[in-house]
């Protein structure tokens, strides 16, 4: 797809650190035996084998060359409960990617939730470990913390949170929470995720927060946060909208060209 290559080139030219290409893994349900509950309701359950996934990465690398600088492995297991049995399959997959493309090839996995201690030991670079709305991010369930202690033991650059439904009222709290937790990668959007169990569920959301980029007022916050000057930006923005104050004598005329909204203070003497 020529457009994929072009968009990746534009992103890199604009300052993006890496361009990674999307490949599904569908929880590696293809590795499960017939009749296993983990295969239930997974579309094309036998399609996404290790061989197929590796083939998709090779196609991306062949077609896009140096622009393909990593892979985004979507729909990865979190390693908890029955999913623990698929950790060896993910280890095999990730180890083969690493052996084929080297340490500079960025491997990103998307579990969408916190991951088990055994999953943390795999050789990925970044894990998208949160993918919910701002309400869930700001009011986390302490029984299932966003970043458990075993994850906090790793560098912040290993963790990536995606927060939907961000508003003008809560975005500061979202950034503050990410800083407090030690999450180095953050994608915020005012887009909403809506799933209808009767119309495809998680596999075909009726409301997709990634269908369009975030609104401009949200986009304008991300780079300042990444570079550490968001508080300064917000202070400057506030000064820009603060009304001007003009001190005049009791009978002094307002100067021509005084901006609308200027506060006029009259001196008694």
PLM regions: where:
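Extracellular/surface-exposed low-complexity repeats and stalk/linker segments enriched in Gly/Pro
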Residues: 236-269
């Amino acid at each position: 797809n020529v457009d994929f290559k072009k968009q990746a080139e534009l992103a890199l030219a604009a300052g993006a650190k890496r361009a990674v290409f999307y490949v599904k893994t569908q929880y590696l349900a293809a590795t499960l035996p017939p009749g296993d509950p983990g295969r239930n309701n997974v579309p094309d359950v036998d399609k996404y084998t290790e061989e197929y996934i590796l083939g998709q990465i090779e196609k991306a690398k062949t077609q896009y060359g140096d622009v393909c600088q990593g892979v985004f492995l979507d729909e990865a297991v979190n390693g908890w409960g029955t999913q623990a049995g698929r950790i060896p399959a993910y280890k095999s997959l990730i180890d083969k990617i690493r052996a084929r493309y080297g340490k500079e090839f960025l491997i990103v996995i998307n579990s969408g939730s916190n991951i088990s201690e055994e999953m943390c030991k795999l050789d990925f670079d970044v894990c998208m470990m949160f993918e919910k709305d701002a309400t869930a991010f700001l009011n986390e369930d302490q029984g299932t913390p966003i970043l458990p202690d075993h994850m906090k033991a790793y560098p912040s650059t290993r963790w990536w949170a995606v927060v939907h439904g961000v508003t003008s009222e809560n975005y500061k709290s979202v950034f503050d929470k990410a800083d407090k937790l030690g999450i180095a990668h953050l994608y915020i959007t005012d887009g909403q995720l809506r799933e209808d169990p009767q119309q495809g569920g998680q596999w075909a959301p009726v409301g997709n927060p990634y269908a369009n980029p975030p609104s401009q007022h949200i986009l304008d916050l991300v780079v300042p946060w990444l570079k550490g000057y968001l508080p300064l930006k917000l202070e400057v923005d506030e000064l820009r909208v603060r009304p001007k104050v003009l001190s005049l004598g009791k009978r002094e005329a307002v100067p021509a060209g005084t901006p609308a909204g200027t506060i006029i203070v009259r001196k008694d003497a």
